[in-house]
Every structure is written in structure tokens, then in C-alpha cells.
Regions:
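Short S/T/G/P-rich N-terminal loop/turn motif that feeds into the first structured element of a domain
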Residues: 1-46, 50-68, 72-97
Length: 97
């Protein structure tokens, strides 16, 4: 069963691009679609994954280390907590590839 989720982060586009560069170009296993939108106070991430386990593996093995690396390079000595994640029941996805 697919997994759809949303979370907001207090980051700008430049920080997002640095995190993406740290993650690399390889498409994460199980990712169906990932959107990033400007939102009040930062960026909103919307993801659709094959499963919650695929999202969690990507978060733990790729996203979290990349965020820590970028924030440490920016001078952070403590890492902020993970943002709250809202989960949704996925009804449909249309993509024009």
C-alpha cells in the first residue's frame, strides 16, 4: 500500500538545494513523487512512496545524514528536531512522465 505524507521545514531554497546535493542524484528506492513548495515560514514537502518503510529507510540512511552535514557546515552545534509528519490515505496519483 502506498504511503503519502507532508511536512514543513523552516528552511530556504538554498538550504534545500544543499541538502539535495548531499543526498545525490540517485532516485530513492520506493519514491513515487516528491514535491517541494514554498510555504509560510519555509518549505512544504509532499511525498508519495511505495511504503512507509521505504520513506523511513530513505529518511534514516540518506536524508537525516545529509541534513546533519549541511547544518553542521552552516555552524549548527545542535540539530533541530524532525518536523511533524502528516500522513494521508492516498487515493490516486496522476503523473505525466
Amino acid at each position: 500500500m502506498s504511503y503519502a505524507m507532508l511536512y514543513d521545514v523552516p528552511a530556504d531554497e538554498e538550504t534545500y538545494r544543499r541538502v539535495n546535493a548531499a543526498i545525490g542524484d540517485e532516485k530513492p528506492k520506493g519514491l513515487i513523487v516528491h514535491l517541494v513548495l514554498q510555504a509560510e515560514g519555509g518549505l512544504r514537502h509532499i511525498g508519495v512512496w511505495d511504503s512507509q518503510q521505504d520513506w523511513q529507510r530513505f529518511h534514516d540512511e540518506h536524508l537525516e545524514p545529509a541534513v546533519h552535514s549541511v547544518l553542521t557546515a552552516a555552524g549548527f552545534t545542535e540539530m533541530p528536531p524532525d518536523p511533524p509528519v502528516q500522513e494521508f490515505k492516498l487515493v490516486d496519483v496522476w503523473m505525466n512522465a
